[in-house]
Amino acid sequence: MSHKKIVEFEPYSKGLLSKVNRQGEVTNYDYDSNNRLSEIRIDGKHTQQFTYDHLDRIVKLVENIKNEKSYTAETSYDVFGRIKKETYPDGYAINNSYDSYGNLISVTDSYDNKIWQGLSANARGQLTKTKQGNVEKTQFYDSRGLPSSISAAAIMNMAYTFNNKGNLISRSDLLTGHKEDFTYDAMNRLTAWNISKDNISQASNSIDYNPTTGTITTKSDVGFTFGYGEENGKPHALTSLSGKPDRIPNLTQTVTYTDFKKVKNISLGSKSLVLDYGVDEQRRKGIFKDGSATFTRYYSGNYEEEVDSSGKVKKIHYISGGDGLAGIYINDDGNNRFYSTYCDYQGSLLALTDMNGVVKERYAYDPWGNRRNPASWKDTETRTKFIVDRGYTLHEHLDGFGLINMNGRVYDPLLGMFLSPDPYVQAPGNWLNYNRYGYCYGTPLLYTDPSGETAWLIPVIIGAVIGAYTGGTIANDGQYNPAKWDYSSGKTWGYMYGGAVAGGISGATGWAITGSGMPMANTAAIAGSSLTNSAYTGGQTPV
């Protein structure tokens, strides 16, 4: 059976794209008198309308989703072109303040709450002390700029140790006494992780790989052998397990896909999820069902709205500071709550607190992203509902299915692989890239996957959009357009790496959630998307 899809492109009179016809679904592109994109629409499904200022910056974005919801987000800038104010669709707003060097030093909201403050930084420009609500957070780094500890009162106190290759060899929760030690093979792939508490061994885990294909052959928490390519299947596509793990329900899970290869439907027993995508092929609506219970989630930039079957509306606002996600403001059917967010070095959510640091919910994950009991790392998570569904590297957990939606693709943290292949071979010189179902080259503690299609080094290293961009420009002889950079050159990646370390801004936390309509998705993503997309398409971007 052919899997080819016919896509027709119709140019505008001035050489600009006018229409894209994908199997009868037409995406229309309109432009203003200055040839700026003014509207993208799929009739009856999704529309985006853009308003610009005199410097061609987007100041207003209006979205219509399925003719059911209309959202307007606005952005204003100061005289230096920095984002001064961001207004969410329901009128809630955040304000940014900067020092004389252009560093973000504070984020406040419509109610004058001090959400985030930058207090001090080291010589590299990495933030060492910040304040979230009324609580100070301290971060220390080793001589290479890698994180050695992150602490905040009685909320979190994490310690990290990296080897000379940059791989994490241990992490410790000094509040609970937990420690996890890691070992790697010659390809830097994780091979074992062992948990102890108060120096007493709790659990040992291991994983093995096929030496030819790089696929996982066994994983101790699964407990059975992985089979690939059976019945003329693809050599990297999982086709069987030699038994049924206890953590997998005795039900058939069915997944269907759109013609652009993103998950459309998931069903498991009485549970189901139906996703709708917008003009940018990012999810805009999800209908979640569990038996008779139903709720709908709409996604629009750094704002989400949940509507349950009784019509109650939960409005979720994600707010970024200078070192990633800083807070979440929730209006739950008129009841307002604000949470400060505390994340690990990869941007995974560890705790939600009130403004005074009182912990409301804690979270923990194994190296592959499985939820586990924060009070007992050897045990799996038993809770089924959380204040927010964001967690591992700030992606959206689909807890009813045991999956994580990583924007471009859906990931199974128990199996340690994606459900579908990566559309890109990111680094053709690295043979591990040809296992396109694999997660982060088998090195989940060094990389994150913000888009579900591209692995990035840990956020604290290459998170700085500005630093990485500057380094890439230098490496390519002053070429300012990242679409024209040589991504096959080690010099490009090396200079981007160095520039990001010097920049010291962990903006990859924002990148991790850009594709899903999360923090930084509306404004900073506009600045960063050219760099990001060029990186994972080898410079072949449509703009």
What are the functions of these language-model segments?
Residues M1-F338, V358-V359, R372-V388:
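Acidic/glycine-rich beta-solenoid
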Residues N64, L174, E396-L398, V410:
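Residue-level signature of beta-propeller blades and closely related beta-rich strand-turn architectures
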Residues D112, Y365, S420-Q426:
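Peri-catalytic substrate-binding/gating loops that frame the active-site cleft of hydrolases
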Residues R189, Q282-R283, N407-R409, M417:
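Short, cationic motifs built from Arg/Lys/His that form the positively charged side of catalytic pockets
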Residues Y228-E230, N331-N407, R436, Y441, ...:
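A motif-centric feature for acidic-aromatic and gly/ser/thr-rich catalytic loops and repeats
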Residues D259, Y345, D412-L414:
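A cytosolic small-molecule/anion-sensing beta-strand core signal
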Residues L352, N370-A375, R409-L419, P423, ...:
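Short, low-complexity export/processing leader segments characterized by acidic and small residues
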Residues S451-V543:
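Extended, hydrophobic alpha-helical membrane-active domains that insert into or remodel lipid bilayers
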